């Protein structure tokens, strides 16, 4: 532990009881640049200003040449700070980069930047007793040089931003209502569905807003080729659980157009440890009526129960009557196990968590630009 007592305790300037999922100002972010002169990513800079200086003709702004990630850091009972499966985020970040001609960020640099971003903002990691709250981590990379024609960019920027957050959704107690999206497809069969790029998300915002106005907390996508198979929710993965004659089976849609969710993978591993059967396969929409429980799963949503799924074109409404508040529900068992591992009150049998390193031992560069007020 460093002489100044790393990690710092949770800041008294933050009202930890009223966190949302909206950004609040922190100490700064980590930033790296890639230039053709050296053909590699440069050293990390700690930048206090949350605003980025980007040319208006940058391909990221004009052609959507950008990628992002989502991950979290948690404070443990001993006061240390843990990351959850960060190497999987590094792998997925490189996978996304391959779709949009961005030089891959080496795993070592990705992890170093994440450790620095969290470590230099350690007082913004929520207290251990604020269950469900965490420091949200948003790595991004984008083409930042000025390029008008659709051609390879020269310069790229990689950043890691952080902010303390509460869970995006608590599931409204007994679950959210989901609407099957019928007016727009999320991803084409040979498209970018497995990459975390903005183009997979921006087109669905209007549909999500309309659904919310109609009382739906989630929007569910079917495959774009036949509209018969379940893909995923607009901003999270799908998991279903079926209990039949005392046997529990977890079903997870498997398709090349689905984002490889780290939280979904973790839930599958946890389910297997319970002795449940886990099936990663194509899941038809009609099969949803056979499920006992259904969830939206992701870094932001964590594990959010679904109360009903409505499909207007067939006048179908599938309802789930499980008591999600029951300690015996699949929802409660999965959620408590995941959060217990993430926050350190259960043993990490899989070695998923990684303790954040003291940034004082890293020779990063500090930017002198102050944050704008």
Swiss-Prot record:
Pathway this chain belongs to: Mycotoxin biosynthesis
Cofactor(s) in the UniProt record: pyridoxal 5'-phosphate
Upregulation: Expression is up-regulated more than 10 fold in toxin producing cultures.
EC number: 2.6.1.-
Domain of life, source organism: Eukaryota
MF GO annotations: branched-chain-amino-acid transaminase activity
Record-listed pyridoxal 5'-phosphate binding positions: 92, 232
Listed Pfam families: Aminotran_4
Keywords: Aminotransferase, Pyridoxal phosphate, Transferase, Virulence
Sites of N6-(pyridoxal phosphate)lysine modification: 196
Alphabetical GO biological process terms: branched-chain amino acid metabolic process
Role description: Transaminase; part of the gene clusters that mediate the biosynthesis of AM-toxins, host-selective toxins (HSTs) causing Alternaria blotch on apple, a worldwide distributed disease. AM-toxins are cyclic depsipeptides containing the 3 residues 2-hydroxy-isovaleric acid (2-HIV), dehydroalanine, L-alanine which are common for all 3 AM-toxins I to III. The fourth precursor is L-alpha-amino-methoxyphenyl-valeric acid (L-Amv) for AM-toxin I, L-alpha-amino-phenyl-valeric acid (L-Apv) for AM-toxin II, and L-alpha-amino-hydroxyphenyl-valeric acid (L-Ahv) for AM-toxin III.
Similarity comment: Belongs to the class-IV pyridoxal-phosphate-dependent aminotransferase family.
Additional detail: Gene clusters encoding host-selective toxins (HSTs) are localized on conditionally dispensable chromosomes (CDCs), also called supernumerary chromosomes, where they are present in multiple copies. The CDCs are not essential for saprophytic growth but controls host-selective pathogenicity.
Protein name: Transaminase AMT5
Species annotation: Alternaria alternata
């Amino acid at each position: 532990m460093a002489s100044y007592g790393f990690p710092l305790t949770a800041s008294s300037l933050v009202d930890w009881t009223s966190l949302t999922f909206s950004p609040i100002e922190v100490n700064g972010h980590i930033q790296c640049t890639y230039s053709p002169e050296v053909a590699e990513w440069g050293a990390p800079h700690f930048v206090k200003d949350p605003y980025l200086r980007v040319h208006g003709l940058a391909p990221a702004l004009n052609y959507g040449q950008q990628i992002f990630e989502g991950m979290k850091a948690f404070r443990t009972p001993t006061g240390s700070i843990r990351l959850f499966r960060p190497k999987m985020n590094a792998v997925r970040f490189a996978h996304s980069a391959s779709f949009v001609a961005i030089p891959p960020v080496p795993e070592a640099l990705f992890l170093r930047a994440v450790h620095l971003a969290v470590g230099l903002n350690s007082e913004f990691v929520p207290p251990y007793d604020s269950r469900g709250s965490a420091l949200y981590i948003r790595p991004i990379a984008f083409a930042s040089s000025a390029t008008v024609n659709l051609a390879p960019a020269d310069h790229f920027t990689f950043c890691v931003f952080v902010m303390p957050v509460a869970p995006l959704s608590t599931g409204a107690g007994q679950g959210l209502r989901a609407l099957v999206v019928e007016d727009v497809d999320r991803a084409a069969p040979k498209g970018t569905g497995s990459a975390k790029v903005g183009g997979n998300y921006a087109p669905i915002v209007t549909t999500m807003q309309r659904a919310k106005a109609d009382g739906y907390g989630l929007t569910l996508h079917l495959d774009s080729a036949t509209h018969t198979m379940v893909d995923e929710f607009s901003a999270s993965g799908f998991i279903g659980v079926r209990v039949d004659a005392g046997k529990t089976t977890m079903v997870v849609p498997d398709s090349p157009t689905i984002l490889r969710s780290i939280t979904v993978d973790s839930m599958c591993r946890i389910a297997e440890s319970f002795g449940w059967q886990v099936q990663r396969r194509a899941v038809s929409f009609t099969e949803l009526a056979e499920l006992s429980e259904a969830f939206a799963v992701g870094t932001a949503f964590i594990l959010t129960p679904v109360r009903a799924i409505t499909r207007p074109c067939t006048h179908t409404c599938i309802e789930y009557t499980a008591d999600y508040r029951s300690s015996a529900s699949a929802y409660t068992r999965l959620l408590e196990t995941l959060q217990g591992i993430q926050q350190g009150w259960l043993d990490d049998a899989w070695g998923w968590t990684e303790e954040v390193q003291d940034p004082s031992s890293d020779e990063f560069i500090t930017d002198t630009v102050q944050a704008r007020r």
